[in-house]
Design a protein with these regions (language model features):
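Basic- and hydrophobic-enriched, low-structure N-terminal and domain-boundary segments
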Residues: 1-169, 173-178, 186, 223
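Short, glycine/polar-rich helix-capping loops at beta-to-alpha or helix-loop-helix junctions
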Residues: 460-469
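P-loop NTPase motor domains
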Residues: 27, 144-145, 152-448, 463, ...
């Protein structure tokens, strides 16, 4: 950026020198014509007897004559003529009904079919800001004439951003990295979904040097990262237990769903989670998903029934377990087997360690500068339910934290950078994913901003069907299109861009009694 700015300034200086040189050269040349004409008039000025002397084209002679009286008059005349031409062109562009476009057609202001057009300079400055890299603090959206185009800090837009770009369109390099640099400059918190772990490798030290608390939830290599126990945030809250249950069931279905089996497994899982969370004989470090999986796999159905029958009738875990118990023995065996299959990733010792205790505080980003990296796998989805759980609980905890803070906002603004958004899993406890849509529409007032990046609109439609994808995009006031290779995304962006009315000239020939009568027709 700095090199480009220096080159731009150097180009301006060189162009100014060349322009002044050309002006003085032409002024001196025209000044010689004035001088020679004056001499010719003083000698009689008779055509055919004497001739006007030709000017000397030598640059040195022209530059010398530029400082004579006739040279000054010539320079003034050239400046006046040039200014007149510029004023004429500007006035013609402003008041003309039509404007020529660089793409090879003439735009019509009639607006018969539409008035879509690129932003004018005035319109751009009313919504966005132009700044140098050294002074830019807002979200960087692009570059225009050597200046950065940014979303200003005092904007009325909601700051949510949707990025569309196929592989290789530089989503990470051109947009997300710049967003992280701006976040550091503003002193805000960031939570980054990192599918390739490249963001952590490239930017984590920069965050640390700027006083950030840096954590990493590594779902690809759990041994090299911090731990997060999702059950540490329950604290007996049955609604949070329901969210946990729904997220796990919703993100371990492998694209297939059977309400009968899903509901049975959800009831059993919720009962086990609440049993573990409210067991006063268990130390806090054992209240985790690994222990829930141990209860499921180390006890028979009869043993589980005896355990739950010992609970008081009003215990929160009794109701979901009683629903599970209504099934036949064959169905109960199928439910236990199905739930065990969903949670089989907990057989891995590294994953058990990952979910056993918490190094990560979900409310900390709202109180002081934090940078949390969630490293995701872009190859398989067995750990997707953990990333979905993390962001689902994050929205709930941060929103509640903001509501209890002065002004109903997070003291430190929080930015969620969701690269490869579709790899995260379905966020929220609602089976259809509508919880994320609702969260996106209300978190702006809590100073929580979301930037999500997808490769295509089709991906988003598959993850959030039934027009939920439209709600998500509709809640993003900023939409960046970096490139696409599919018709769905291309058609959507084209429709959003609108239609422009252009001028069309055609010639019609009317044959009347075999005598051609041509007519020219212009329209738009």
């Amino acid at each position: 950026m700095q090199m480009n700015e220096k080159q731009r300034k150097a180009a301006i200086i060189v162009a100014s020198i060349l322009g002044c040189g050309a002006l003085f050269y032409l002024g001196g040349l025209l000044g010689q014509v004035f001088t020679n004409y004056t001499i010719w008039m003083e000698s009689g000025g008779m055509w055919g007897q004497t001739q006007i002397a030709a000017p000397d084209w030598n640059p040195a002679v022209c530059l010398l004559n530029a400082f004579s009286w006739n040279g000054v008059k010539a320079i003034f005349l050239i400046v006046v003529i040039g200014a007149g031409i510029v004023i004429y062109v500007k006035v013609h562009e402003k008041f003309s009904q039509n404007q020529y476009d660089d793409r090879g057609f003439t735009k019509s202001k009639a607006g018969t079919y539409g008035t879509a057009d690129w932003m004018t300079e005035k319109e751009l400055k009313s919504v966005l800001e132009l700044s140098t890299p050294e002074r830019a603090t807002g979200m960087i959206l692009g570059e225009r004439k050597g200046q950065l185009v940014c979303l200003p800090e005092n904007t009325r837009l909601n700051r949510h951003c949707a990025i569309f770009g196929a592989s290789g369109t530089m989503k990470s390099r051109a947009v997300i990295r710049n967003a992280l640099f701006s976040i550091i400059r503003r002193g805000e918190s960031a939570l980054i979904a990192d599918p390739k772990s490249e963001m952590y490798s490239d930017t984590s030290e920069l965050f640390r040097k700027n006083g950030y608390e840096v954590k990493v939830l590594n779902l690809v290599d759990p041994l090299h990262g911090d731990s997060w126990n999702c059950m540490s945030d329950l604290n007996g809250n049955t609604m949070m237990a329901q969210v946990l249950t729904n997220v796990i069931i919703g993100n371990t279905s492998n694209g297939k769903s059977d309400h009968f089996w899903d509901n049975g497994e959800a009831n059993l899982l919720k009962a086990l989670v609440l049993y573990t969370d409210l067991d006063k004989t268990l130390p806090p470090e054992r209240k985790n998903l690994a222990y829930v999986y141990q209860l499921l796999t180390h006890n028979s159905e009869k043993t589980l029934t005896i355990m739950f029958e010992k609970l008081p009738p009003d215990h929160p875990a009794r109701a979901p377990f009683n629903l599970f118990s209504q099934s036949s023995d064959t169905v109960k065996s199928g439910i236990i087997l199905g739930l065990g299959t969903r949670l089989q990733v907990l057989q891995n010792e590294a994953v058990k360690q990952l979910v056993s205790f918490s190094d990560i505080d979900l409310t900390a980003p709202g109180s002081h500068k934090c940078a949390y990296y969630i490293i995701l796998s872009d190859q398989e989805t067995s750990m997707a339910f953990l990333s979905s759980l993390f962001f689902s609980f994050l929205f709930i905890k941060l929103t509640r934290f903001a509501d209890l803070s002065p002004g109903g906002r997070c003291p430190v603004p929080v930015n969620l950078i969701l690269d490869e958004f579709n790899n995260i899993g379905r966020i929220g406890g609602a089976p259809d994913g509508s919880d994320f849509c609702r969260s996106l529409s209300v978190i702006r007032s809590r100073d929580i901003r979301v930037m999500l990046a997808v490769q295509s609109l089709g991906q988003l439609q598959n993850r959030y069907p039934n027009n939920l994808w439209s709600e998500i995009i509709g809640n993003c006031d900023i939409q960046l299109m970096l490139g696409c290779t599919d018709d769905v995304t291309a058609d959507y962006i084209s429709d959003r861009s609108g239609e422009m009315c252009i001028v069309v000239d055609s010639t019609m020939t009317c044959l009347l009694y075999t005598s051609p009568s041509p007519r020219d027709i212009s329209g738009s």
